[in-house]
Design a protein with these regions (language model features):
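Active-site cores that bind ATP or allylic diphosphates and position pyrophosphate for catalysis
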Residues: 139-186
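N-terminal Rossmann-like or analogous alpha/beta NTP/dinucleotide-binding catalytic cores
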Residues: 2-156
Length: 186
């Protein structure tokens, strides 16, 4: 099995990245323009740090004739607070921080580069993940959260810098070698 086959097994229905590159072309902005974003999680109120970050992002985009957008990082749906997106939009407006594009209410976004809720961009990310696997630059991980926690605990106990060091990449390569040897012995 090669990387392309592996990618097709994992993401059989993912579109080719050329589809998204055509759908989301490079923005027609002046040279030096900056595109900035504020990506809060809808888990409660906007705090002063979030306001500061969005103010700086808004100013940088404005000063360079760029774009400031609001994309909501709603992937932690267990902690999501009802009507938090409306609260975020309202808080930004209270401080005269208005995005050029992105979420403008709980369910509505404005702009040509949406969707502006992270959870609704899954197909885009799958297409690029498939592309990276095809290139051999990414691999599937089969570890559970408990496995990752166990690895981290062992590393900390051994006073090793915690990190995930390609455990499943080695598994994929080993699995592929095993398949290749089986094919040769037939």
């Amino acid at each position: 099995m090669d990387y392309k086959e592996l990618a097709n097994l994992i993401f059989p229905d993912a579109k080719d990245i050329s589809y998204y590159e055509e759908k989301y072309p490079e923005r027609d902005l002046p040279e030096g323009a900056i595109v900035t974003r504020f990506a809060p999680s809808p888990t409660g109120f906007v705090h002063i740090g979030g306001l500061y970050q969005s103010l700086i992002a808004r100013k940088l985009a404005s000063q360079t004739n760029g774009v400031f957008f609001l994309r909501v990082e709603d992937t932690d749906q267990k902690r999501e607070v009802e009507n938090a997106v409306s609260g975020i939009v309202s808080s930004l407006k209270d401080f005269a921080i208005e995005p050029d594009e992105g979420m403008i209410s709980e369910e509505e976004g404005k702009g040509n580069y949406g969707p502006y809720k992270q959870s609704q961009r899954k197909e885009i990310y799958q297409a690029y993940a498939k592309y990276l696997i095809e290139q051999g630059k990414a691999y599937p991980c089969f570890c559970t959260p408990e496995d990752v926690e166990e690895i981290r605990a062992k590393q900390e106990a051994a006073k090793i810098r915690p990190g995930y060091y390609g455990v499943c990449n080695i598994m994929v390569i080993s699995f592929q070698k095993d398949l290749n040897q089986r094919a040769l012995s037939m």
